[in-house]
Amino acid sequence: MQLVLGILMLAQLSLPPGASLPQVMSANFKPAGAIKAGQKADIVVSFTVIKGFVIDRTPQITLKLSEVPGVKLAKTEIAAPPEDPKSKDEYFVDLPSIHVMATASKAGKYEVPGKLTYFFCNKADGFCSKQTVDVKVPLLVQ
Protein backbone atom coordinates (compact mmCIF):
# COMPACT_ATOMS: atom_id res chain seq x y z
CA MET A 1 0.00 0.00 0.00
CA GLN A 2 2.81 2.43 0.89
CA LEU A 3 4.53 1.70 -2.42
CA VAL A 4 1.36 2.52 -4.37
CA LEU A 5 0.87 5.71 -2.37
CA GLY A 6 4.50 6.71 -3.04
CA ILE A 7 4.12 6.12 -6.78
CA LEU A 8 0.92 8.18 -6.87
CA MET A 9 2.65 11.06 -5.07
CA LEU A 10 5.59 10.97 -7.51
CA ALA A 11 3.22 10.92 -10.48
CA GLN A 12 1.56 14.10 -9.22
CA LEU A 13 4.93 15.87 -8.96
CA SER A 14 6.20 14.81 -12.37
CA LEU A 15 6.01 17.14 -15.34
CA PRO A 16 4.19 16.33 -18.57
CA PRO A 17 6.35 14.84 -21.33
CA GLY A 18 8.50 17.49 -23.01
CA ALA A 19 7.89 20.05 -20.26
CA SER A 20 10.74 21.47 -18.25
CA LEU A 21 11.08 23.53 -15.12
CA PRO A 22 11.50 27.28 -15.55
CA GLN A 23 14.92 28.70 -14.72
CA VAL A 24 14.06 29.90 -11.24
CA MET A 25 17.26 31.82 -10.44
CA SER A 26 19.50 33.84 -12.74
CA ALA A 27 23.02 35.14 -12.19
CA ASN A 28 24.25 38.67 -12.81
CA PHE A 29 27.96 39.34 -13.28
CA LYS A 30 29.65 42.64 -12.45
CA PRO A 31 33.36 43.34 -12.11
CA ALA A 32 34.31 45.21 -8.92
CA GLY A 33 36.34 47.58 -11.11
CA ALA A 34 38.19 47.85 -14.43
CA ILE A 35 39.79 44.56 -15.44
CA LYS A 36 43.42 44.97 -16.49
CA ALA A 37 45.54 42.31 -18.20
CA GLY A 38 47.83 40.50 -15.77
CA GLN A 39 45.98 41.75 -12.67
CA LYS A 40 43.58 39.77 -10.49
CA ALA A 41 39.96 40.80 -11.07
CA ASP A 42 37.03 40.36 -8.69
CA ILE A 43 33.77 39.59 -10.51
CA VAL A 44 30.75 39.81 -8.21
CA VAL A 45 28.01 37.30 -8.98
CA SER A 46 24.60 38.30 -7.64
CA PHE A 47 21.31 36.48 -8.07
CA THR A 48 17.66 37.19 -8.81
CA VAL A 49 14.77 34.76 -8.28
CA ILE A 50 11.41 34.48 -10.03
CA LYS A 51 8.59 35.72 -7.80
CA GLY A 52 6.92 32.94 -5.83
CA PHE A 53 10.07 30.84 -5.50
CA VAL A 54 12.64 30.65 -2.71
CA ILE A 55 16.21 29.35 -2.66
CA ASP A 56 17.38 26.85 -0.04
CA ARG A 57 20.37 27.85 2.10
CA THR A 58 21.55 24.23 2.32
CA PRO A 59 22.70 22.56 0.17
CA GLN A 60 24.70 25.63 -0.79
CA ILE A 61 24.49 27.50 -4.08
CA THR A 62 27.54 26.41 -6.10
CA LEU A 63 29.26 27.70 -9.20
CA LYS A 64 31.59 25.30 -11.05
CA LEU A 65 33.71 27.03 -13.68
CA SER A 66 35.81 25.66 -16.54
CA GLU A 67 39.19 27.20 -17.32
CA VAL A 68 39.56 28.90 -20.70
CA PRO A 69 42.82 29.73 -22.50
CA GLY A 70 44.22 33.06 -21.34
CA VAL A 71 42.28 33.17 -18.04
CA LYS A 72 43.53 31.82 -14.72
CA LEU A 73 40.87 31.24 -12.06
CA ALA A 74 41.70 31.39 -8.35
CA LYS A 75 39.05 28.65 -7.80
CA THR A 76 37.03 26.59 -10.23
CA GLU A 77 34.37 25.69 -7.66
CA ILE A 78 32.82 28.36 -5.46
CA ALA A 79 30.07 27.91 -2.87
CA ALA A 80 27.91 30.71 -1.54
CA PRO A 81 27.78 31.09 2.24
CA PRO A 82 24.58 29.55 3.66
CA GLU A 83 24.20 32.14 6.42
CA ASP A 84 21.43 34.73 6.22
CA PRO A 85 20.78 36.69 9.44
CA LYS A 86 17.27 37.64 8.26
CA SER A 87 16.20 34.06 7.58
CA LYS A 88 14.03 32.29 10.12
CA ASP A 89 13.80 29.05 8.12
CA GLU A 90 15.82 27.11 5.56
CA TYR A 91 15.38 29.69 2.77
CA PHE A 92 17.30 32.85 1.91
CA VAL A 93 15.65 36.21 2.58
CA ASP A 94 18.65 38.07 1.11
CA LEU A 95 20.45 36.06 -1.55
CA PRO A 96 24.24 35.89 -1.12
CA SER A 97 26.87 36.97 -3.63
CA ILE A 98 29.75 34.91 -4.96
CA HIS A 99 33.12 36.37 -5.92
CA VAL A 100 34.97 34.96 -8.94
CA MET A 101 38.66 35.87 -8.85
CA ALA A 102 40.30 35.70 -12.28
CA THR A 103 43.45 36.90 -14.02
CA ALA A 104 43.55 37.33 -17.80
CA SER A 105 46.96 37.20 -19.47
CA LYS A 106 46.12 39.75 -22.17
CA ALA A 107 43.45 42.25 -23.21
CA GLY A 108 40.32 40.94 -24.93
CA LYS A 109 36.84 39.52 -24.41
CA TYR A 110 36.52 36.22 -22.60
CA GLU A 111 33.62 34.03 -21.49
CA VAL A 112 34.25 31.54 -18.72
CA PRO A 113 31.65 28.74 -18.91
CA GLY A 114 30.22 27.21 -15.79
CA LYS A 115 27.34 25.48 -14.09
CA LEU A 116 25.26 27.13 -11.39
CA THR A 117 23.56 24.65 -9.05
CA TYR A 118 20.96 25.44 -6.40
CA PHE A 119 17.87 24.05 -4.71
CA PHE A 120 14.57 25.91 -4.86
CA CYS A 121 11.01 25.61 -3.63
CA ASN A 122 7.71 26.99 -4.86
CA LYS A 123 6.01 28.59 -1.86
CA ALA A 124 2.50 28.12 -3.32
CA ASP A 125 2.51 24.36 -3.83
CA GLY A 126 5.54 23.20 -1.83
CA PHE A 127 7.29 21.72 -4.88
CA CYS A 128 11.08 21.67 -4.40
CA SER A 129 13.84 20.65 -6.78
CA LYS A 130 17.52 20.89 -7.62
CA GLN A 131 18.37 22.97 -10.67
CA THR A 132 21.62 23.25 -12.62
CA VAL A 133 21.92 25.91 -15.31
CA ASP A 134 24.68 26.84 -17.72
CA VAL A 135 26.22 30.27 -17.21
CA LYS A 136 28.99 32.30 -18.85
CA VAL A 137 31.06 34.72 -16.80
CA PRO A 138 31.93 37.63 -19.13
CA LEU A 139 35.35 39.28 -18.85
CA LEU A 140 36.24 42.44 -20.78
CA VAL A 141 39.94 42.92 -20.17
CA GLN A 142 41.82 46.13 -20.99
Task: Identify the meaning behind each predicted range.
Residues L3-Q12:
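Sec-dependent N-terminal signal peptides
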